[in-house]
Amino acid sequence: MVLNAPAPLVPAETETIKIKAVGDLVMGTNYPDNRLPADPRKSLFSDVEPTLRGADLLFANFESTLTDYPTSSKNINRPLIFAFRTPPSYAKILKDVGFDILSIANNHSLDFHQQGFDDTAKNISSAGMRFTGKKGAITYMTVKGITIAWIGFSHMKAAHNNVNEISEGVALVKEAKKKAQLVFISVHGGAEGGPALHVKNEQERFYGEYRGNLVALSHALIDAGADLFIGHGPHLPRALELYRGRLIAYSLGNFLGYRVFSTKGYGGYSLVLEVDLDKNGNFVKGKIHPLQLSQNGIPSPDPENKTTELMQSLTKADFPGKGPKIQNDGTILP
């Protein structure tokens, strides 16, 4: 009698949470003049909407305001001073495209005073999304039965958790970890432009502002229990690092800046970062989906993979032996 041999055991695939994240997002402004697109959802997102789909969570840094407040807190007559105001109705577009949570901790969220900041938070919530970035606040959400906490930081001390106050950030992460299984960090920090391409383990300054030591901050927050660190603010992509099994993305660059961002040089290199984490927060795998920005700041897929090549180079240069493996097709492995 011949007995059938038992089928070999196949290891179950690790259940993961998939996050997709993009950097700085401005859909246009109607202040001080009208720089808004016609048919905004189609004109701004049609080329990248398929790439944004398919995640359990979709995140962006919303670097504008959603308000009708008439006067700005900034003197835009001074050189290199900009104020962004986007119609509140545009919040629904972001929801329809698929965004789940937006950071409002950045240097434009107070462009229209506290009222504009409060309006932005209210309009994001009314559209069915969540936000992170209020000082002292932790945003909780549940995905696949797992409680996730988000904490947003910037260099703006008054309204946001500050990148330079590391001990306060550590305390927030420890507080979040009491209720959440995973803690995700969004940070608007670091200097801007070409000279800021490389990550350095030192305080970064930009026009006299202290923009944080992002290496020290990310490591301290992960030591305290954070599981993912998403950076934005330098307006160009930066290196990736793996620290204690957690992924650090030091900058995702510009994602969308309709007629408001410079897209010259690395300012036009963009991406959608895809990250898979296990239920304990360990980095499992990821992918760089490279994008390019048009002269008007509209994203589309980049067939030349320039962003992937740039981030490969930066990761090897800035974190030799400490970065994840970035393959030529954009796949990221521990």
Predicted region positions:
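Acidic, metal/ion-coordinating pockets
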Residues: V2-P334
